[in-house]
Swiss-Prot record:
Protein name per Swiss-Prot or TrEMBL: Ribosomal RNA large subunit methyltransferase G
Pfam families, alphabetized: MTS
Reactions performed catalytically: guanosine(1835) in 23S rRNA + S-adenosyl-L-methionine = N(2)-methylguanosine(1835) in 23S rRNA + S-adenosyl-L-homocysteine + H(+)
Entry's EC annotation: 2.1.1.174
Native organism: Escherichia coli O1:K1 / APEC
GO cellular component, one term: cytoplasm
Top EC category: transferase
Annotated localization: Cytoplasm
GO molecular function: 23S rRNA (guanine(1835)-N(2))-methyltransferase activity; nucleic acid binding
Length: 378
């Protein structure tokens, strides 16, 4: 846990999933402080929109203004709810919207934590363009190293005149005034042909590797299991290309597409509808934090390309949680398949959780591993 003192309230905040005590990561950053310093209670008029509030620092600080928290991360929503509870703040003080929803009209203040993906930022700025006014105060913040010329140019292009502040504690702010500059329309998704198939893969703005098949997925697809039955999970599904391939290779199986990103799940659904509509009755689409709340002993197999970062921070906490959830939800003799960068040493992590691990394939960068749920472990 960490403490954030600001002009609105003193907060105790924690990351979600929680980090270990040996390598603790803070649930807020200097950019959060810097953004809050710009506001005065007396100047907030109209709806408050907060975009990409990773762990709820801004939402908790401004809870009395009933802000809207907008983003593409279910984990961030869970983190914000947890931190609201931790600080004794009514959860209903914050209204949650995903990035594909319609934003509230004529906001008084918009606070943006600049996301890692420029495409997501553009999608969000285009959505804001429909609702902000010249009187809306628009402020964005991030680590100084993450604000580039291209970031400023995007604000200028979509919203209007943009300036940046001096760095403070290695954070920098962007101030923008809306003047409705001319702007061409843009498609909601980017699409490309998947080589070796007749499929067209569609990707919403925040999908990993949205402009082409990433090399880890490419390697994984060469080693996917075939002729499985029952339920299979594409965990952390992204655009669903792994799950789509599983549907094709396992015609007797049902595939559950799971991701914490609403845009990822929407992309997966769109890709099944577009490329294998006849298989829709064998699909389930789930926005979730890994397999939270899913009953144990349900699945025959779980397939996963786990992330090793959360927002801008490098961490294996998300992957570790995915592995534990997979083990809980697999049937006895059910199998977990993962692809990962070799340097992450997931072999020993899986062996610790499952009691076994087998290397299926390896190249100079990636490894495909399999672990089997052999029985109940104390």
């Amino acid at each position: 846990m960490s403490h954030l003192d600001n002009g609105f309230r003193s907060l105790t905040l924690q990351r979600f999933p929680a980090t270990d005590d040996v390598n603790p990561l803070q649930a807020w950053e200097a950019a959060d402080e810097y953004l809050l310093q710009q506001l005065d209670d007396t100047e907030i008029r109209g709806p408050v929109l907060i975009l990409n509030d990773a762990f709820g620092a801004l939402s908790c600080a401004l809870a009395e203004h009933k802000p809207y928290s907008i983003g593409d991360s279910y984990i961030s929503e869970l983190a914000t709810r947890e931190n609201l509870r931790l600080n004794g703040i009514d959860e209903s003080s914050v209204k949650f919207l995903d990035s594909t929803a319609d934003y509230p009209q004529q906001p008084g203040v918009v606070l943006i934590k600049v996301p890692k993906t420029l495409a997501l930022l553009e999608q969000q700025l285009r959505a804001l363009r429909k609702v902000v006014t010249p009187d809306t105060r628009i402020i964005a913040g991030a680590k100084a190293r993450d604000i580039h010329t291209s970031t400023l140019e995007l604000f200028e292009k979509v919203l209007g005149p943009t300036t940046t502040t001096l760095a403070w504690k290695k954070a920098r702010l962007i101030n923008c005034t809306f003047n409705e500059p001319p702007l061409a329309d843009a498609p909601q998704t980017v699409s490309w042909k998947l080589e070796g198939t007749d499929w067209t893969i569609h990707n919403h703005a925040n999908v990993f590797s949205r402009t082409g098949l990433d090399i880890g997925a490419r390697f994984f697809m060469q080693h996917l299991p075939e002729n499985l039955e029952g339920e299979i999970v594409d965990l952390g599904c992204g655009n669903g290309v792994i799950g789509l391939t599983l549907l094709d290779k396992n015609p007797q199986a049902k595939v559950v597409f799971v991701d914490e990103s609403p845009m990822a799940v929407a992309s997966s659904r769109l890709n099944v509808e577009t490329n294998m509509p006849e298989a829709l009755d064998r699909c389930e689409f789930m926005i979730n934090n890994a397999l939270s709340g899913v009953e144990p002993f349900r699945f025959n197999a779980v397939l996963c390309n786990p992330p090793f970062h959360q927002q801008h921070a490098l961490t294996d906490n998300v992957a570790w949680e995915m592995f534990h959830h997979a083990r809980r939800c697999l049937k006895i003799n059910g199998e977990l398949y993962i692809v990962a960068n070799r340097h992450l040493d997931y072999f020993h992590k899986l062996k610790k959780i499952f009691g076994n691990c087998t290397t299926i394939a390896t190249n100079n960068k990636f490894v495909v591993l399999k672990a089997v749920k052999l029985g109940r472990r104390r």
